[in-house]
UniProtKB/Swiss-Prot annotation:
<dbReference type="InterPro" id="IPR055346">
    <property type="entry name" value="Fe-S_cluster_assembly_SufBD"/>
</dbReference>
<dbReference type="InterPro" id="IPR010231">
    <property type="entry name" value="SUF_FeS_clus_asmbl_SufB"/>
</dbReference>
<comment type="similarity">
    <text>Belongs to the iron-sulfur cluster assembly SufBD family.</text>
</comment>
<dbReference type="Pfam" id="PF01458">
    <property type="entry name" value="SUFBD_core"/>
</dbReference>
<dbReference type="InterPro" id="IPR000825">
    <property type="entry name" value="SUF_FeS_clus_asmbl_SufBD_core"/>
</dbReference>
<protein>
    <recommendedName>
        <fullName>Iron-sulfur cluster assembly SufBD family protein PH1385</fullName>
    </recommendedName>
</protein>
<dbReference type="GO" id="GO:0016226">
    <property type="term" value="P:iron-sulfur cluster assembly"/>
</dbReference>
<dbReference type="InterPro" id="IPR037284">
    <property type="entry name" value="SUF_FeS_clus_asmbl_SufBD_sf"/>
</dbReference>
Length: 446
């Protein structure tokens, strides 16, 4: 079908998908209008993607119509085997009721499992599938939905807005501090599928929350697209941590879109651990930081095979005393390409920003590029950048091998130590799994 598909054909397919989604989700008219307006922008917007060309995009669009409401499950035991295996390895099954505030799971185009501790709901924590939040909290959603994005930015942005499906709405009431993390997992089960969850985070004054996202797919999935969009709104003194753990198989393209508006004295820490980047992974999150606000963007990147990974981050320090840090550590193997970009714009006095990029090259054919951008529009601003790209030092290997380690074990130990500082805010059960994957990758078994 994709060989003869045109943009006009794509328009008809997307129109059918919009109607199916509106019917399936019992969607209010104002949301359906947003979808149709995005479709108009899709037809004329630039693609702006170095890997996904128009033919590839049309392959995703050519997927048959969205089916009915995904069947919900009441127990973790009823989840798809791939997701259940992942949760078992992480110990989620055992700790769900005790140590985490809740868990949601989305397969393909809908949330099928959503369990959150009732005591937190009574205190003012709202966690719902996005389509349900649109119906139950229309005023809040109208105020925040797509206020940080414009459909005309690119075809992929417009496509997401037109066909978004699933995701969650996370609302934290004023003064509520959730001490345990919320977990959200995405699983792609079908090939040639575009999964487009929409996530909205609203943290009211003096609130705190930590959301952990996990992304994966069975190894046999071919040529699928994960196209998620996250909007975060942090009010005064709010603290939000967003941790994203990606482990996609090699034929999945990933295009996460994250933006956050960080209010006065608020703090947003966004950490991405990309262990399985899929065929390509391109992201350029944006943040707007208010007076004395703070944003920290951390990235741990594992490049393998012929993967193409291009991760950036743009920070606008708009309020006096605003601060931003963009830090990444990359381990690059085989013939993979990793590109890191960072841009910090100082727009107010007494702002500070720093970009750091460290990379370990484990192959002569691996490639690393870094593009820092520091822009000061005021006199009283401090902006800085540092980068270090190189191979493992022979003396480090020699020392560890002299202590009885094989070269493989020594390399694994060095690589794990290299990324360790970036994992400080991640629960230990995830850190253990991350280190296992790194060990397998370095030894050629991943």
């Amino acid at each position: 079908m994709s060989e003869t598909l045109t943009l006009s054909d794509a328009k008809s397919i997307i129109e059918n998908q919009i109607e199916e989604l509106a019917k399936r989700n019992k969607e209010p008219e104002w949301m359906t209008k947003i979808r149709y307006k995005a479709l108009e922008e899709f037809m004329k917007a630039p693609l702006n993607d170095p890997v996904i060309d128009e033919e590839t995009l049309l392959n995703f669009i050519a997927k048959p119509e969205i089916e009915g409401i995904p069947e919900k499950v009441e127990s973790l035991d009823d989840l798809p085997p791939e997701m259940k295996d992942l949760l078992d390895r992480l110990g989620i099954n055992e700790v769900e009721q005790k140590y985490i505030a809740g868990l949601a799971v989305q397969t393909d185009t809908g949330v099928i499992y959503n369990q959150f501790l009732q005591e937190w709901a009574k205190k003012g924590l709202i966690v719902l599938p996005t389509e349900e939040a649109v119906r139950r909290y229309p005023d809040i959603m109208k105020e925040h939905f797509l206020k940080l994005f414009k459909a005309g930015e690119s075809k992929l942005t417009a496509y997401h807005i037109a066909i978004w499906n699933g995701g969650i709405f996370l609302y934290v009431k004023e003064n509520l501090k959730v001490p345990f993390p919320l977990h959200l997992f995405f699983l792609i089960q079908e090939s040639s599928l575009a999964q487009a969850p929409h996530i909205t985070i609203i943290a009211e004054k003096n609130s705190e929350v930590h959301l952990i996202e996990g992304c994966t797919a069975p190894i046999l999935v071919r040529h699928s697209l994960h196209l998620d969009m996250t909007e975060a709104y942090l009010h005064e003194n709010a603290k939000v941590r967003l941790t994203v753990l990606q482990n996609w198989p090699e034929y999945v393209h990933t295009r996460p879109m994250t933006r956050a508006k960080v209010g006065r004295n608020a703090e947003f820490i966004n950490t991405t651990v990309s262990l399985g980047a899929g065929k390509s992974n391109i992201a350029n999150p944006k943040y707007w930081v208010g007076e004395n606000g703070y944003v920290e963007l951390n990235g741990v990147i594992l490049g393998q095979k012929d993967w193409y990974i291009d991760l950036g981050g743009e920070m606008h320090l708009q309020g006096e005393g605003g601060r931003g840090i963009n830090a990444s550590k990359s381990v690059i193997m085989d013939e993979s390409t990793v590109i890191t970009r960072g841009k910090i714009v100082a727009e107010a006095k007494k702002t500070k920003g720093h970009i750091s990029c460290d990379a370990l090259l484990l192959s002569d054919k691996a490639r690393m590029e870094t593009y820092p951008g520091l822009v000061s529009l005021v006199d009283e601003a401090e902006l800085s950048h540092e980068a270090a790209i190189g191979k493992i030092k022979e003396e480090e290997l020699f020392y560890l091998m002299s202590r009885g380690l094989s070269e493989e074990k020594a390399t694994q130990l060095i690589v794990k130590g290299f990324v360790e500082p970036m994992l400080k805010d991640i629960p230990i059960e995830f850190v253990v799994e991350i280190k296992k994957i790194i060990e397998l990758a370095v030894s050629g078994g991943f």
